[in-house]
Regions:
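Conserved P-loop
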Residues: 33-102
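Short, well-ordered alpha-helix to beta-strand connector turns
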Residues: 34, 61-62, 114, 141, ...
Length: 206
């Protein structure tokens, strides 16, 4: 049975929040280090590069693992890391080379395991919703960011859609621009590639 908490306890509760600033504060607010986020969009719109930008920014606050199930250790992943200047973060971001669900769970049970895990993608991991709930329950002090393909303008598949509905923050990527929705306020867009975003959205200078 769950706890019944008084209003005073609820209002006095403290949470582990990340002190975002600049464009990330404007986009997301000051989020908790818990639960799930989602990044979704069509191919060739900047989705992977944005996920790398997010990994780099989150590494200012904690350790980040990027589980690349689609591409693994590859030239395209290397190029994405170079594009966002990932060299600056040192050992605070690690790439997991196509690590499956079971191995990821074992890793997260170790001491000094990553605080944030980016799973790229929901579809290539073959994640079930029960496994998703298991991660949330077993690791309540970690943040999971799920990258998803799309069908139309929504995440592809029932599992991805259920994660999307449950996520505290999600970013829709289109035309090299991220459109966030956050339970922590925010809401301002972030450009993955400003020149291409302006061209796509018809804002380029004449």
């Amino acid at each position: 049975m769950g706890q019944a908490l008084s209003v005073t306890k609820v209002l006095n509760a403290k949470f582990h929040t990340l002190e975002f600033d600049g464009e990330w504060l404007a986009a997301v607010g000051q989020p908790e280090l818990t639960g799930s986020w989602m990044v979704y969009g069509a191919p060739k719109n900047g989705k992977t590069t944005f996920a790398m930008m997010l990994a780099k920014y989150l590494s200012r606050f904690c350790r980040v693992a990027y589980d690349s199930l689609e591409e693994g250790l590859s030239q395209s992943i290397q190029m994405s890391m170079e594009r966002v200047g990932m060299k600056e973060v040192g050992g605070r971001v690690v790439l997991l080379d196509k690590e499956p669900f079971g191995e990821l769970v074992k890793r997260l049970h170790r001491q000094k395991s990553p605080d944030v895990v980016i799973i790229d993608s929901v579809q290539f991991m073959g994640l079930t919703f029960d496994e998703y709930k298991r991660l949330k329950t077993a690791f309540p002090d970690k943040l999971f960011v799920y990258v998803s393909h799309v069908a139309g303008r929504q995440p592809e598949g029932q599992v991805a859609k259920r994660i999307w509905r449950d996520a505290n923050v999600y970013f829709r990527i289109e035309g090299y621009r991220a459109f966030p929705v956050s339970r922590y306020k925010g809401g301002a867009t972030i450009d993955v590639w400003k020149e291409e975003a302006d061209r796509y959205w018809g804002l380029e200078e004449s």
